[in-house]
Amino acid sequence: DIMLEAVQNAIATNEVNASMGIICATPTAGSAGTLPGILSVITKQLSLDRDAQIRFLFCASAFGMVVANDAMIAGATGGCQAEVGSASAMGAAAAVEAAGGTHQQSSEAFAMAMSNLLGLVCDPVAGLVEVPCVKRNVIGSVNALTSADMALAGLVSKIPADEVISAMKSIGENLPSTLRETGLGGLAATPTGIALKMQIFGQDMSIDK
């Protein structure tokens, strides 16, 4: 199954990251599983050779540079929408390019993918890039593939890519610090999240003590 393969490879990349292995930050370590999940699927489905895979990465990087220059790509400054959201949008645009779509279709895929993840907060349990980050990479991969399919089918984003990036920046700037990678809000602040932090570190790591 196409989606299950994306799930498998997105998780696998994040497992390597969690075990201190070598990964490529795309655009960050916390979102490093999203692009591999996408690329593994389209490489098989489209029979991409090495050059085509490299073009995929270049296309994704180009869109990522725009986000980095015009907004942000770090969870600490913009929440998870800036990490997995950006990675998903980058992958969607590159998937369209790999499938032979137009530049405009790549832009539409990018806009739809990022729009779908606007507002996603960064709330890592115990401050580690594992829970819920790994599974969010999966969502990023699947979101990218469906956004690419929609763009290739002729669907368009009513809001253009540049404006979606601006909206993401504005949302990120308005997120409270507790929801920007500090591990002090969201899932990290739940009873189970706090218990897991205590289990890992063996002490109260809160800043309020």
UniProtKB/Swiss-Prot annotation:
UniProt keyword list: 4Fe-4S, Gluconeogenesis, Iron, Iron-sulfur, Lyase, Metal-binding
Cofactor: [4Fe-4S] cluster
InterPro entries (alphabetical): Fe-S_L-Ser, Ser_deHydtase-like_asu, Ser_deHydtase_asu
Cofactor binding annotation: Binds 1 [4Fe-4S] cluster.
Recorded GO MF terms: 4 iron, 4 sulfur cluster binding; L-serine ammonia-lyase activity; metal ion binding
Catalytic reactions of this protein: L-serine = pyruvate + NH4(+)
EC code: 4.3.1.17
Pathway: Carbohydrate biosynthesis; gluconeogenesis
Principal EC category: lyase
Biological process annotations from GO: gluconeogenesis
PANTHER family noted in UniProt: L-SERINE DEHYDRATASE (PTHR30182), L-SERINE DEHYDRATASE 1 (PTHR30182:SF1)
Family recorded in the similarity comment: Belongs to the iron-sulfur dependent L-serine dehydratase family.
Subunit description: Heterodimer of an alpha chain and a beta chain.
Protein name: Probable L-serine dehydratase, alpha chain
Species this protein is from: Latilactobacillus sakei (Lactobacillus sakei)
Gene: sdhA
